[in-house]
Regions:
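N-terminal Rossmann-like FAD-binding beta1-loop-alpha1 element of flavoenzymes
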Residues: 2-28
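Glycine-rich Rossmann-fold phosphate-binding loop(s) that bind the pyrophosphate
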Residues: 7-9, 31, 36, 383
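Glycine-rich FAD pyrophosphate-binding loop
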Residues: 21-41
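Active-site substrate-recognition segment that forms the wall
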Residues: 43-46, 51, 55-95, 180, ...
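Dinucleotide-binding Rossmann-like beta1-alpha1 core, especially the glycine-rich loop
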Residues: 44-170
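Short beta-strand to alpha-helix junction loop
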Residues: 103-116, 139-149, 190-209, 323-330, ...
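Flavin (FAD/FMN) cofactor-binding core of flavoprotein oxidoreductases
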Residues: 140-145, 170-175, 272-273, 281-284, ...
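Helical element adjacent to the flavin cofactor pocket in flavoenzyme catalytic cores
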Residues: 148-160, 180-248
Length: 428
C-alpha cells in the first residue's frame, strides 16, 4: 500500500513512522528543508495531560473582552482576523459551557494518556534522545482561590487517571528549588508527576531519520499546491516539483490543512493561533530549573532542554502572520523573570532566539482525527496547543485506520463529523 503523508511535523512524521511499521510504502511531503520546522520547531516542550483543560471554557469569553486592546494580553484577538473566523468563533462560544468543557477535557485527556504511552514505546524501540526531562510538571497559581478553581476542574478528570497533588508554595519549591526566590509571589500549585517535557523538534527530526532509514521517501522543500479528486477519492497531489500519487493520503498540515481541502468541499474548523517562545542559554543561570513550570493565570511556561531554557506562551489570533510582536515577547520575558529572577541573567539580544508558530486550534480543543468524506483521505490535524502531547498517539491511531485496522483508542470523539456541517465530495 502506497501512502503519502502531507506534513512533516510531529503529527505527520509519527504517522509515517507507524505506517512503515504497518508495511506501507510511505512518502512524506513538506515545504520546509527538514522535519519539524514549523509548529513543532520551538514549542514549549510540555508533554502534559494537564493541558487537557480546554481553552473553550466558562469565563473565557469575558476574559477575552477584558483583554481587548492589550498588546501583552494572554490571548489577543486582532480585529483583522475576525472576518475569517466568525463561524469558528460562534462554535467556540457554544463550547464555553461547563458540560462541553468537561467533555472536551475528557477527550483530550484520553488521547494525551494514550499518546504518552505510545511515546514511551517509541522511545524504547528507537533509543532516541531529545533532551527529555521525566520529572513531572508543576502548574503554579497566584491565589488559593485559583488553586481551588483549578483543582475542581482536575478533580473531575481524576477518575480517568489524571494523577496530581495540591501543593503550597513550599511544596512547589521542594520539587523545583529554582522557585525559591519567588516563593512569596505565588500561593502554591498542582504537581502532575506523570508528565514529561522534551525538545519536540529534536524528537521529530530523529523519528524522520528513523523513517528514512526504514525506506520512507522524504520530499522536503516541496510545496503542496492542490489535491486532485475524482469519484469520491483523491487521485493525486500537485506540488511545485511535479505530481505525486498513492493509494491513500494523510493530511497533517496543521493550520494550513483547511486551505488545502477547502476546494474539495471539506470545511475544517481550524484557525491558526500564534504562540511565542524565547530560547536562551542556561549557562548564566546557576541553579536553573529542571522541572517544567506553567503559570496558569499568566499563561506562560518555562522548560529546560539540556543547556537551553525556553519561555513560552501567548495566544494571538492574527491569521497566518508569524512575525514576532516585540511587546508580546517582552510580556513573556517579564512574567518569566518575575517568577524566576535568575532567568534574567540569561537574557541577551545577541543569544536570545525569539520564535513564533501557529497552533491549529479547533473550537472545542480536541484534534480532528480519522476519515474524511473522500474514501482514501485521512485527517490528522487540529492539535492546537497540545500537538507535542498528542502527536505520538494521534500518529499511531490514524496509521492504524489507514491500514484498515481498528485503532487502540476510539476515534469517534475526534472525528470531523462532530462539527456536523462539512460538505460531501464535489461531483466531477
Amino acid at each position: 500500500m502506497r501512502t503519502i503523508v502531507l506534513g512533516a511535523g510531529i503529527a505527520g512524521t509519527l504517522t509515517a513512522y507507524h505506517l512503515l511499521r504497518e508495511g506501507h510504502e510511505v512518502t512524506v511531503v513538506d515545504r520546509q528543508p527538514g522535519a519539524g520546522m514549523e509548529t513543532s520547531f520551538a514549542n514549549g516542550g510540555f508533554m502534559a495531560s494537564s493541558q487537557a483543560e480546554p481553552w473553550a471554557a466558562p469565563g473565557v469569553p469575558l476574559k477575552i473582552l477584558k483583554w481587548l486592546g492589550r498588546e501583552d494580553a494572554p490571548l489577543l484577538l486582532r480585529p483583522s482576523a475576525v472576518p475569517q473566523m466568525w463561524r469558528w468563533g460562534l462554535r467556540f462560544l457554544a463550547n464555553c459551557t461547563e458540560a462541553r468543557a468537561l467533555a472536551s477535557g475528557e477527550r483530550s485527556l484520553k488521547l494525551a494518556h494514550y499518546s504518552i504511552a505510545v511515546l514511551k514505546q517509541v522511545r524504547e524501540d528507537t533509543q532516541i534522545a531529545y533532551d527529555e526531562v521525566i520529572k513531572g510538571c508543576i502548574r503554579v497559581y497566584g491565589s488559593a482561590e485559583a488553586i481551588d478553581a483549578a483543582g475542581r476542574f482536575y478533580a473531575k478528570l481524576a477518575p480517568l487517571g489524571l494523577n496530581y497533588r495540591v501543593l503550597d508554595a513550599a511544596g512547589c519549591v521542594a520539587i523545583e528549588p529554582a522557585l525559591g526566590p519567588s516563593a512569596a509571589k505565588f500561593a502554591g500549585g498542582l504537581f502532575f508527576p506523570d508528565e514529561e517535557s522534551g525538545d519536540c523538534h529534536k524528537f521529530t527530526q530523529a523519528i524522520a531519520s528513523v523513517c528514512q532509514q526504514g525506506g520512507a521517501a522524504l520530499r522536503y522543500g516541496t510545496n503542496v499546491m492542490a489535491l486532485e479528486a475524482s469519484g469520491g477519492v483523491i487521485t493525486g497531489v500537485v506540488t511545485d516539483k511535479g505530481r505525486l500519487s498513492a493509494d491513500r493520503y494523510v493530511l497533517a498540515l496543521g493550520s494550513y490543512s483547511p486551505l488545502l481541502v477547502r476546494p474539495l468541499g471539506i470545511r475544517l474548523p481550524i484557525v491558526p493561533v500564534k504562540g511565542y517562545s524565547i530560547t536562551v542559554p542556561a549557562a548564566l543561570w546557576p541553579g536553573a530549573l529542571t522541572v517544567p513550570i506553567a503559570d496558569d493565570e499568566r499563561k506562560f511556561g518555562l522548560s529546560r532542554f539540556g543547556d537551553r531554557v525556553r519561555a513560552s506562551g501567548s495566544a494571538e489570533i492574527a491569521g497566518y502572520d508569524t512575525t514576532p510582536n516585540e511587546a508580546r515577547a517582552n510580556g513573556i520575558l517579564k512574567n518569566a523573570t518575575d517568577l524566576f529572577p535568575g532567568f534574567a541573567n540569561c537574557l541577551d539580544p545577541a543569544t536570545n532566539r525569539v520564535w513564533c508558530g501557529l497552533r491549529p486550534m479547533t473550537p472545542d480543543d480536541p484534534p480532528i482525527l480519522g476519515s474524511s468524506s473522500y474514501r482514501n483521505l485521512f485527517l490528522n490535524t487540529g492539535h492546537g496547543h497540545m500537538g507535542w502531547t498528542f502527536g505520538c498517539g494521534a500518529g499511531k491511531a490514524v496509521a492504524a485506520l489507514v491500514a484498515g485496522k481498528t485503532p487502540d483508542i476510539e476515534l469517534t470523539g475526534y472525528a470531523l463529523d462532530r462539527f456536523a456541517r462539512h460538505r460531501q465530495p464535489q461531483s466531477d
